Amino acid sequence: MNWHLYIPYKNTPRPADGHYLGQIASVYLNDDQTLIKRTYNLNGVTVNDSPSEYSAEFIKERWAREYRWINEFNGEFFMPELIDANYDEGWTVQKYYGPDLLIQGTSQIPNVEDQVLDIYKFLKEKEVYKKNGSLSNMTHDNGRLIAFDYKWTVPRDTPGDHKELEERSIDLWLSKISLDLVPKLKALL
């Protein structure tokens, strides 16, 4: 199978909110754009067309989180279909549903607010903070919201400022779906 580097973002100049997209994983699409492969390695080119500025140790730690959560949440109503993953080599292959919501918007998702709330209710039940609810980490499958990218996800009892980072994710990114979501999501924290 042939894989083609996927670079949907050029983060030049610095984005207005100061948050560069795609700083860790290299992303590839297969020939017919039905599968997406993400690799976690120090020498890759990220979706913003630059190498990661993170250390090998940092990338490995984020990969371990990604691997854990895509396997624990595999098959859930909001997860992309997992085709294959290799922990030792640091890659996943999932079904590709099309561009992320930052690119395609949310107009094709009839009840997007309810679906976001359902996902975050699930995450609360599982006692985790996702911490990156960016539209660039969501897509849809014929109106069904798909959330991906779990490398920042941590159990809620992990020491650190994770709750504050989840609030920031709500304020910066999930609020772009609807400002009405903000208090509802924060109530789940």
Regions found by a protein language model. Give the residues of each.
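Conserved structural core of kinase catalytic domains
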Residues: F58-Q115
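Protein kinase-like catalytic domain
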Residues: N74, L123-K124
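Hydrophobic residues embedded in beta-strands of well-ordered beta-sheets
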Residues: L35-I36, G90-T92, R144-L145
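Conserved hydrophobic core/spine positions of the Hanks-type protein kinase catalytic domain
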Residues: Q115-F122
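Conserved protein-kinase catalytic-loop position immediately C-terminal to the HRD catalytic Asp
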Residues: S136-N137
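Active-site beta-strand termini and strand-to-loop segments that position acidic
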Residues: Y28-D32, K95-Y96, D141
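ATP-binding glycine-rich loop module of kinase domains
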Residues: N11-Y67
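C-lobe/activation-segment region of protein kinase-like
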Residues: N111-V112, E125-K131, H140-L189
